[in-house]
Amino acid sequence: MRKIYIHICAVLLGLAVISCNHTNQRQQTGNSGTAISKKALKDSTVVKQTVNTAAQVYAKPEVPVLCYHRISDGPKSEYRVSPETFSAHMKILADSGYHSILPDQLYDYLFYNKTLPEKPVMITFDDSRAEHAEIAAPVMEKHGFRGVFFIMTITYNKKNYMTTDQIAQLEKAGHTIGLHSWDHTMVTKYKEEADWQKQVADPKKKLEGIVGKAVEYWAYPNGVYDHNGAEELSKYFKLSFSLYSKRDSAVPLQSVRRMIVPECTSQGLLKSMHRTFGR
């Protein structure tokens, strides 16, 4: 009887040891799983993108930004180049190794330090003239260039100006559509909330309906920069473009400088770019 009792105790002790070992194994497995899970979480953590301060944006080398207005034959003017001259300008840019960039690329370069192609240049157009779609765009596309077209929404579907279909087609072809106000009223005259609604908020919404995407870039009417206006524009746009005005170190993203391109030779264009932007 005593032998049977001892045997039963031994069996029970063995079962207890097995149970403890199994529990420890489960705990170890669980701890290991937790450790793996934490490691995986750590490895999958997205590193936040570094952004530049206003001072850092202001310190970055400028990119040449060209601005064309009318592309037609007629009296010589700072705001007009002939179709032949425009074609020659695009050819010399291509032959000289320039690469056209769009505002998204410029913004990423200024704000996030993204790399730009060698010899970047931005080609922009103000006032939504019909010849921008009918003459300029095909010439640029022939050289692999894309441009930026700033639209006054009061003009579309009117004589000598782009139609809504042309605006949408430019966007589909890889160009960028920006806003140039409703009726070309200068930002310095936006005094009331109603002015901002009429010249910026409402036209922006209408233009977005035409192109089917956000409109994130602005060109100052008449190229006239305004510091107070720039602060307000930063609520609507990533970048705003002026003409010749000095950049504002407080809001450099809203004071991107452009150069008006007049009737001039191809070599004259390159010299003006170098003189204005240093490249």
Segments the model singles out, each with a brief description of its role:
Residues A16-S19:
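C-terminal motif of bacterial Sec signal peptides marking the signal peptidase cleavage site
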